[in-house]
Amino acid sequence: MIASALSFIFGGCCSNAYALEALVREFPSSGILITFSQFILITIEGLIYFLLNDVQSLKHPKVPRKRWFVVVVMFFAINVLNNVALGFDISVPVHIILRSSGPLTTMAVGRILAGKRYSSLQIGSVFILTIGVIIATLGNAKDLHLHVESMTRFGIGFTILVITQILGAIMGLVLENTYRIYGSDWRESLFYTHALSLPFFLFLLRPIRSQWNDLFAIHTKGFLNLPSGVWYLCFNTLAQYFCVRGVNALGAETSALTVSVVLNVRKFVSLCLSLILFENEMGPAVKFGALLVFGSSAVYASARSKPKTNGLKKND
């Protein structure tokens, strides 16, 4: 299961990152439409799966629906805000930099809210991993300052991403505790976190419609005479399905910190692929960053977490 989850994460998430970068280059304010498309596809696929294979999970889910509510609110906010941030002068390289603090945030929140304790090897490896991603990204974001036309807008985007990091760490702990209490079922998690989020999009119908119309406003046509942006959106949505499928499957088998570390390594791989596919030079910074990322990941894999002193309480 873990090997399968990793293949989905690195295959789906890296493909998703490529399509996302191509899309936001032409449509930087398409974040809400991107998120909505992803949620629709994943919900439809999940509904078909359960209707054909496991109707009982729709009637009587392993995890109570009211338990999912807190997770769904955070999950929806994280996904929407992450994509919305790209419209506030946050370039893809900067996006990777700011989100690379995930493992550190997970550790801090885990220590404060759940009383988790981590070994020195884990703390050191996560810190070095984060530094590696930042060095590699900064070394190749040569035009970083050109994207910051307004420090106020950049500050808003930065704040949004900080909030999503904290929410993501809290959500990871809640999910970890939920799986410990009720048992893990990544299929159920994938479906309910997306399906129960759909009503929130009713408040965002106007920007969704506007962003969809923007895709058809360009003159560049692709396959079947559809705008290239539509195809990038379709590819991004499909890739995101495989990405979140892998993340949910991994989260059902491992800790929140392990998921965060794996996603950080994935971000670095996405950066390297972005450099290659967009014909950017892979300079010394990327090579040095690679050494830090993969070296620290190997150290983390060999480290073990100390038992929690006190976990989150069951509160339904």
UniProtKB/Swiss-Prot annotation:
Keywords, comma-separated and alphabetical: Endoplasmic reticulum, Membrane, Sugar transport, Transmembrane, Transmembrane helix, Transport
Pfam families recorded: UAA
Compartmental location: Endoplasmic reticulum; Endoplasmic reticulum membrane
GO-annotated cellular components: cell tip; endoplasmic reticulum; endoplasmic reticulum membrane; Golgi membrane
Top-level lineage group: Eukaryota
One GO BP: UDP-N-acetylglucosamine transmembrane transport
Lumenal side: 25-31, 89-120, 175-187, 236-274
InterPro entries attached to this UniProt entry: SCL35B1-4/HUT1
GO-annotated molecular function: UDP-N-acetylglucosamine transmembrane transporter activity; UDP-xylose transmembrane transporter activity
Membrane topology, as annotated: Multi-pass membrane protein
Record-annotated membrane-spanning stretches: 4-24, 32-52, 68-88, 121-141, 154-174, 188-208, 215-235, 275-295
Residue numbers on the Cytoplasmic membrane side: 1-3, 53-67, 142-153, 209-214, 296-316
Chief location of this protein within or outside the cell: endoplasmic reticulum
Known function: Sugar transporter that specifically mediates the transport of UDP-N-acetylglucosamine (UDP-GlcNAc) and is required for cell wall chitin synthesis.
PANTHER family membership: NUCLEOTIDE SUGAR TRANSPORTER SLC35B4 (PTHR10778:SF4), SOLUTE CARRIER FAMILY 35 MEMBER B (PTHR10778)
Family of the protein in this entry: Belongs to the nucleotide-sugar transporter family. SLC35B subfamily.
Protein's UniProt name: UDP-N-acetylglucosamine transporter yea4
UniProt gene name: yea4
